[in-house]
């Protein structure tokens, strides 16, 4: 996949742990861009998970690599270092969406809930939490059409991933028994995960030799 050149940096966003940047690319679309602040490991995790998630039919917004020109970064002043003049990960900005709330749980298709739960367990992503007390599900909701959008995978492939914590805090943890303890449901999920594996190799192969976030591809280590 060829990287799109960023033609305008609009602002730094307030949402998100790493506060990504809203940018306009050469295709005139708006993207949420993550750069150096996300860390090279996090950027690679985003890239790999976006491919794997799409292969599993998860509703992940269109994504791309973004080339950020040095002159645009310099114009940001001190904040420019958080983005960096390098290759960034871009997720297309979606309109008409809001942060996912626990009240919307019942509106999410049960098959999609289980598919996402299996995916997050598979890629060791514990960063999708939500309960009555709050949390950070890294999900968006489009009320028109009851559509879920899945975002933010920079903390996947976590070396300190703890299954017990994951199953206690995941936004869709209520589906864990029906998914993992039912032979038919788990066999179906496992087959889907297995079928998605080729997209992992495709994602690796499509990363530029120059790297994402300035780290050469040969140095990527996720596990």
Role assignments for model-derived ranges:
Residues 50-55, 107-113, 167-172:
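Short, low-complexity, polar/charged sequence segments that are solvent-exposed and flexible
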Residues 1-102, 115-126, 137, 143-146, ...:
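Conserved ATP-binding subdomain of kinase catalytic cores across diverse folds
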């Amino acid at each position: 996949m060829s990287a799109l050149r960023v033609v305008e940096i609009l602002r730094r966003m307030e949402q998100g742990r790493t506060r990504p940047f809203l940018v306009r690319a050469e295709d005139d679309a708006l993207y949420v861009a993550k750069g150096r602040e996300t860390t090279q490991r996090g950027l690679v995790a985003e890239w790999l998970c976006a491919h794997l998630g799409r292969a599993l039919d998860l509703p992940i917004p269109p994504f791309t690599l973004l080339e950020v020109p040095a002159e645009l970064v310099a114009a940001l002043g001190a904040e420019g270092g958080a983005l960096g003049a390098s290759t960034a990960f871009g997720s297309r900005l979606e309109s008409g969406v809001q942060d996912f709330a626990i009240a919307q749980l019942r509106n999410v298709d049960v098959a999609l809930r289980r598919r996402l739960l299996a995916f997050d367990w598979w890629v060791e992503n514990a960063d999708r939490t939500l309960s009555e007390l709050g949390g950070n599900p890294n999900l968006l909701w489009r009320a028109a059409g009851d559509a879920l959008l899945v975002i933010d995978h920079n903390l996947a492939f976590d070396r300190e991933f703890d299954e017990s914590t994951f199953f206690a805090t995941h936004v869709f943890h209520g589906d864990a028994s029906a998914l993992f303890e039912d032979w038919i449901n788990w066999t179906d999920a496992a087959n889907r995960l297995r079928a998605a594996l080729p997209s992992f190799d495709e994602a690796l192969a499509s990363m530029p030799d120059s790297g994402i976030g300035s780290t050469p591809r040969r140095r990527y280590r996720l596990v």
